[in-house]
Amino acid sequence: MERRIFRLFASSTGAILCVSTSAFSATAQGTTPIQPGVITSFAPIVEKVAPSVVTVFTTQTVSRGGSAFPFSDDALRQFFGGQLPQTQGKQTLQGLGSGVIVSPDGYILTANHVVSGAEEIMVGLGVDPRKYKAKKIGTDPGTDVALLKIEEKNLPAITFADSDKARAGDIVLAVGNPFGLRQTVTMGIISAVGRGGMGIVDYENFIQTDAAINMGNSGGALVDIKGQLLGINSAIFSRTGGNQGVGFAIPANLAREVMQSLRDKGRVVRGYIGASVQTLTPELADAMKLKGQSTGALVGEVAPNSPSQKTGLKTGDVIAAVNGKKITDARELRLMIGSMAPGSKAQLEVNREGQTKTFELQLAEMPPGTTEEGGPEASPEETTQQPEKTTVFGGVAVADVTDDIRTALNLPKDVHGAVIAEIDADSPGGKAGLREGDVIQEVNKQPVRTAKDLVAISKNLKPTDKILIRVYSQGRSGYVALEPK
């Protein structure tokens, strides 16, 4: 996903009327006084919260050089239709964000993307012009949470709210330092809770708000009307580059859980079952002929020697529930398993080809970098022959996975199939999300080892057949459903 999702823009909530319709009663003489208990100002809340919100300054030196295209060989570039743009030089980048003091002895929560790659981090307290050097205690890209520490005492720590109790419609305030303007406060409501599936981070459970979250607000506080921390402001969605009133905050309960792990261990420890999953869509369920099952987490890949493999989980299984709690999508499964301690037991309810099965497994600890895609870079051979291309599915050109292509695409040795060399964006495959460089491994549960295998399978398909494709893409295997023409 483009980094623009982390770009924070200005927005306006307009005039806010902080009284109920019963606060005034029209009379011939005018209006009656405001009734006791009606909130007419959030100033007391802001005065309580603002000292806990800090400015985070970062410095980073970036090197720009080499190719933006992974293939240095002309034949491979021609094969994939790529170009070879060049950029050179170094640049020092100054970053600006916000943070929240969470303990009197100097621990500060912020967003990971605010401090990611920073060589120096400084913190400004309130409107004090002085800056304090901050140490990075730990980061968690999976949730976009980072924990910093400054060597100061008796700091005004914020109070945490129970973000699980947050509801759409609740009034919230966003406090941060947009564009370097310290102690800026905006107001809105919670638009939704439990937002995910946007590809911002691996573990998404965002609070959505229409409170203005601007550039520099990332890492700042989203608070309730009691002045308690509901979330850490993280991102805003925009198609135009301007504000559209759709901001996202990391729930306080999740941020606190990550913070405690970072503070105690310097890293986040998560449960792990060793299965790559995706959300089961109605189209996939239809292609897989799963009657009565339209939601869940579809297993696209099972890691060797993992808890999933040891207990008998297979690709194509649909995880419908964990410990009796229904799973509606892959996001829910990741959050649930990730929040469980390694060594704990998990009972999985699984739909396998229409049959319900139950598996009990013991969670392992998630290995570092498990969600990273690909592996170490390798240099292609100096000379490469272009493999022959064959077109299938009305606009998908495929070829065999040669040694050169395997090296260029950084494909694991156990990934076999037909690589997509070219694809028509308007073809069924293009519309389903297939892209150049993907490797087709199965079609309707029939294995594909070569382009010839794929051609043979495709010839036996009827025009009205739904097509279920297992594909290796961006470091993972998953499923794609192609609708008939």
Q: What are these model-predicted stretches?
A:
Residues 1-74, 93-94, 107, 120, ...:
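N-terminal targeting leaders that route proteins to membranes or the secretory/organellar pathways
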Residues 103-105, 109-143, 150-154, 163:
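Catalytic-histidine neighborhood of serine endopeptidases
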Residues 61, 104, 119, 139-143, ...:
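Short, conserved beta-turn/loop elements at beta-strand boundaries and strand-helix junctions
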Residues 45, 124, 135-137, 154-181, ...:
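Active-site substrate-binding loop(s) of clan PA
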Residues 34-44, 63, 86-105, 130-133, ...:
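A conserved glycine-rich beta-strand in the N-terminal activation segment of trypsin-fold
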Residues 100, 212-232, 429:
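Catalytic nucleophile loop of clan PA
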Residues 114, 158-162, 170-204, 239-241, ...:
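Flexible, gly/ser-rich surface segments that form the specificity/activation loops bordering the active-site cleft
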Residues 2-10, 26-32, 40, 44, ...:
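C-terminal recognition in membrane/secretory proteostasis and scaffolding
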